[in-house]
């Protein structure tokens, strides 16, 4: 299924963090928080300002980003859980 977000929204796939500690202990899913890092899969056309002009987004498909832990709405696409996030909820691009 193809999905294209509207306006200033982006589709993000969460990046899984390591589930073992440096000493080799395995951390169960119930003890870990949802990761706040992910990869941009799709972007909208941009934010519309008060004059009706479209302002392009700063992020692009493929960018690795950091976002708020509770940002966005989870959706299921082809059995995969993805996030729909506003660009304002993205705090950094990882370079």
Swiss-Prot record:
UniProt-listed InterPro entries: Chaperonin_GroES (IPR020818), Chaperonin_GroES_sf (IPR037124), Chaprnonin_Cpn10_CS (IPR018369), GroES-like_sf (IPR011032)
Location in the cell: Cytoplasm
Keyword entries, A-Z: Chaperone, Cytoplasm
Record-level GO cellular component terms: cytoplasm
Gene Ontology MF annotations: ATP binding; metal ion binding; protein folding chaperone; protein-folding chaperone binding; unfolded protein binding
Family annotation (CDD domains): cpn10
GO terms of biological process kind: chaperone cofactor-dependent protein refolding
Pfam families in the cross-refs: Cpn10
Keyword Chaperone: yes
UniProt keyword Membrane, yes or no: no
Assembly and oligomerization: Heptamer of 7 subunits arranged in a ring. Interacts with the chaperonin GroEL.
General function of this protein: Together with the chaperonin GroEL, plays an essential role in assisting protein folding. The GroEL-GroES system forms a nano-cage that allows encapsulation of the non-native substrate proteins and provides a physical environment optimized to promote and accelerate protein folding. GroES binds to the apical surface of the GroEL ring, thereby capping the opening of the GroEL channel.
Family statement: Belongs to the GroES chaperonin family.
Name used for this protein in its record: Co-chaperonin GroES
Species of provenance: Ruthia magnifica subsp. Calyptogena magnifica
């Amino acid at each position: 299924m193809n999905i294209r977000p509207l306006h200033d929204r982006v589709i993000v796939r969460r990046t899984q963090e390591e589930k073992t500690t440096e000493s080799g202990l395995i951390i169960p899913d119930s003890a870990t928080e949802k990761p706040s890092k992910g990869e941009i899969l799709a972007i909208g056309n941009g934010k519309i300002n008060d004059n009706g002009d479209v302002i392009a987004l700063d992020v692009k498909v493929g960018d690795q980003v950091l976002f708020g832990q509770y940002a966005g709405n989870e959706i299921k696409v082809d059995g995969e859980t993805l996030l729909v996030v506003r660009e304002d909820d993205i705090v950094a691009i990882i370079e």
